Amino acid sequence: MSKEGYSLWLVGGTALLVADTAQPLRQYALDSILFAQLRSDKLNGSRFTRYGRWYSGYRTALEERGWVIVRSRSDHQQSQVGQSLVPVQRLSDDLQARHPSLSGHLRAAITQLSQGAMQQHLQPFTLAEQDKTTHCAYELGVMLPDASLEMCGLAFKSALPASQIRPDTHLQPLPAEGIDLRASAGTLSEYLTVAHRQGLHDLLERTQHVGKIIDLGVLKPEGDDATA
């Protein structure tokens, strides 16, 4: 079990767990993740149209804002008979595989993200209906105590209407076209200045985008970790 405390934030289409001890750099992480999403939207179009291209632009925008990407991965999981998908659980499993001590906090995050009240914020960034098909894109990440980032994303298409899809929706069988999986890990450049960080925050305030960052509060670990 992690003794570190974590809070949960919504940043556009990303749900981010943030370690308490990473607080000095928290605002810049939130700002730069949101900026990178908006930047890729502008340069590469919707994440729902060409997710691979959009994600590449998203990662590049993070690099331009001082994040050094130390690891990245892409994969495509084909649909197979009998397999199912719960989007947020799949992302959580990927993060937990690298950071087992986060299991209780990740379970708590899943509980929060599955609540109906969350969908009003999440839906514009995660779901889009086009020609009787719902295009879905989710990302779950963590800012660790050393202020490094671990991010996992996925995209898929579903015949279900957007109103019937949530991060915890059980999809069986797997979407016919499979699942596009992405992951990135990064650390902040040591050359990033306070003025640089403040400048980005001021930009998001001027352009009225700061409302797309929402603090969901402190996570209370669930499951076995809650009493460990």
Stretches with model-predicted labels:
Residues 1-88, 116-228:
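C-terminal assembly and membrane-engagement modules of membrane-active proteins
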